[in-house]
Amino acid sequence: MLLSRAISVLALLACIRCGVHAQNTEQNLKTQLTTDSAMITSQRLLRTSVDFKDSEERWPTESSRIRSAIKDYFREFPEKVSIAMAIRQIDAHGVRHVEKVLSQYKFPAADQGNIRLAIIHHKAPK
């Protein structure tokens, strides 16, 4: 065991002295830098190509604040959520946010039905 370890240390020293190991490391480093810069560029492109209509990725706090307000509004009333109440929320915050709240949170079946009817009513051609 000691002999095999000594041989591997001598082989490593010989490679380092000849420069073979250093050249290989330099090539690997160049490849690694190229790969890293390509990854950074692609991430930057993804970050800057966000659709401004769906600004969730850029400003998640604003969207989550709106959705939290919608959720709290619907859960505030012990009685059934009416279609008119859902339409008011759609007019105030937009259909996309109300749909997202409906998909993320659980509401009683009657409330879900009324909210869906309000969304359908809002999306229907006038």
Swiss-Prot record:
Leader peptide range in chain numbering: 1-22
Name of the protein: RxLR effector protein BLR31
Family indicated by similarity: Belongs to the RxLR effector family.
Induction of expression: Expressed during host plant infection.
The protein's role, per its UniProt record: Secreted effector that triggers a hypersensitive response (HR) in 3 Lactuca saligna accessions (CGN05947, CGN05310, CGN05304).
Domain of life the protein comes from: Eukaryota
This protein's UniProt keywords: Secreted, Signal
Keyword Secreted belongs to the record: yes
Species whose genome carries this gene: Bremia lactucae
The UniProt record lists the keyword Secreted: yes
Protein localization: Secreted; Host cell
Locus of motif RxLR-dEER: 44-58
Recorded domain comment: The RxLR-dEER motif acts to carry the protein into the host cell cytoplasm through binding to cell surface phosphatidylinositol-3-phosphate.
Gene Ontology terms: cellular component: extracellular region; host cell
